[in-house]
């Protein structure tokens, strides 16, 4: 072991450089392990400026690499090149250690700095059966009334705050049984001030509306899950999945399922998949099934030059989840993430995109999904979902409550005689 040979200054210099390089590697590993344990971090790596996150992963190897390069140079007569590389190794060890500890401290401390305001909200505990209030709709009794919005993005100047407030006021006037907020509530999840701005507006405009938010990719940024749970999932709450990020909500007339898909399938692990299939399999065959998520499935869109990714017909979500929806007869899937409003249909499953709650619209679609039936671009709004005994009525509303488009989905139960389970479709 020449690296640890005692009795000369070179061996001691090697040992010192190696120890510091190992410290740097350990600090870098600890930072990355913590970062990628956070919600949405793996999706951030795959979808947004991947070169930066690859540098953060690989920078811990730089000091060791420089030290390894110095070893062959010790055989030449002049020792200056090897000393120089060892010096660079020591300097890089210090810088990598400092950067790793700084990033780790930021990820831990940022979402915990400042005080989250107490909000006057009617938050719904997913573990409690949802009661509904009936109302007549075109001479039919509405058994359950839902409102859905997504991508409000409090905290950025790219959002139209007036449109957002108008949408909330329209929802408050509608008095739904439940308002689903499908994520990207804030621009940067670790920012307490942005969450406080969101909570302030929600408390002022929809304090009495039963509310159930999902977590989007922006909500999760840099440890934002801590503030999301503190704001929207108190310690007294629970869910059938054991997670605050995905669950089903029991109602008398429908099965409501919330998924944890901030970016794509990065969080769709075996546990969530098994839970989802069990929920769908055992759902009451006489009730419609409506699934909610942040990221979309079928959707029109464009090729994002900044991310170098297709922002349409989601290449992860479609193969991983749509066969499950089709197998168990899901009636409607509602998502955000894409800043349009759109209605689509594929293999008898309907999809609604509602990411238009005030945030800057995505560009005019360069790719129109073959599943698309209707789309509104550069139009702010939300969706109302009214369930009657025969239909799911999907109403796309603009920011002032005007109906832009309506779809009636007749839900047909998939029954097996004597069974209370949905039979998977062939």
What are these regions (language model features)?
Residues 110-138, 192-289, 304-332, 340-388:
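Extended active-site neighborhood of metal-dependent phosphoesterases/phosphodiesterases
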Residues 178, 219, 297-299, 360:
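Feature marks short, surface-exposed loop/turn motifs that line or immediately flank catalytic pockets
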Residues 176-179, 330:
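Proline-aspartate-enriched helix->loop->beta-strand connector
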Residues 154, 186-187, 219, 255, ...:
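Short active-site segment of divalent metal-dependent hydrolases/proteases
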Residues 155-161, 187-193, 264-268:
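Acidic-and-aromatic substrate-binding clefts and catalytic sites of carbohydrate-active enzymes
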Residues 146-148, 179-181, 213, 291, ...:
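Residue-level marker for buried hydrophobic side chains located in beta-strands
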Residues 151, 183-184, 216-217, 294, ...:
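Active-site glycine-centered loops adjacent to acidic/histidine catalytic or metal-binding residues
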Residues 1-159, 165-177, 203, 208, ...:
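Acidic, histidine-bearing metal-coordination/catalytic regions of metal-dependent phosphoesterases
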């Amino acid at each position: 072991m020449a690296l640890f040979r005692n009795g000369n200054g070179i061996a001691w210099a090697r040992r010192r450089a190696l120890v510091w390089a190992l410290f740097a590697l350990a600090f870098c590993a600890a930072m990355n392990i913590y970062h990628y344990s956070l919600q949405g971090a793996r999706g951030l790596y795959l979808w947004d400026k991947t070169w930066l996150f690859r540098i953060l992963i690989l920078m811990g190897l730089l000091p060791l690499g420089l030290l390894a390069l110095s070893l062959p140079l010790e055989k030449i007569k002049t020792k200056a090149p090897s000393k120089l590389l060892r010096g660079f190794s020591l300097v890089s060890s210090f810088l990598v250690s400092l950067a790793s500890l700084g990033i780790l401290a930021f990820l831990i401390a940022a979402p915990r700095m400042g005080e989250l305001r107490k909000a006057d909200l009617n938050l719904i505990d997913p573990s409690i059966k949802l009661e509904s209030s009936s109302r007549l709709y075109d001479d039919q009794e509405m058994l359950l009334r839902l409102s859905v919005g997504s991508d409000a993005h409090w905290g950025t100047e790219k959002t139209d705050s007036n449109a957002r407030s108008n949408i909330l006021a329209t929802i408050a006037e509608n008095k739904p049984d439940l308002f689903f907020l499908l994520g990207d509530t804030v621009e940067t999840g670790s920012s307490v001030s942005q969450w406080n701005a969101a909570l302030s507006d929600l408390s002022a405009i929809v304090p009495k509306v039963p509310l159930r938010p999902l977590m989007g990719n922006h909500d999760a940024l840099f440890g934002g899950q801590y503030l999301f749970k503190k704001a929207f999932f108190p310690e007294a709450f629970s869910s059938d999945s054991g997670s605050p990020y995905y669950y089903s909500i029991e109602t008398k007339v429908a099965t409501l399922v919330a998924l944890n898909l901030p970016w794509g399938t990065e969080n769709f692990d075996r546990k969530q998949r098994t839970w989802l299939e069990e929920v769908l399999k055992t759902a009451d065959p006489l009730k419609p099934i409506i699934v909610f998520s942040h990221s979309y499935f079928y959707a029109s869109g464009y090729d994002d030059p900044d991310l170098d990714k297709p922002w349409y017909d989601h290449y992860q979500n479609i193969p991983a989840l749509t066969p499950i929806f089709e197998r168990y007869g899901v009636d409607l899937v509602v998502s955000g993430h894409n800043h349009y409003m759109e209605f689509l249909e594929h293999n008898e499953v309907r999809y609604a995109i509602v990411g238009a709650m005030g945030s800057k619209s995505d560009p005019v679609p360069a790719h129109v999904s073959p599943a698309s039936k209707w789309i509104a671009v550069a139009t702010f709004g939300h969706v109302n979902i009214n369930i009657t005994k025969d239909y799911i009525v999907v109403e796309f509303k603009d920011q002032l409550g005007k109906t832009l488009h309506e779809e009636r989905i007749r839900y047909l139960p998939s029954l097996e005689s004597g069974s209370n389970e949905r039979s998977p479709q062939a």
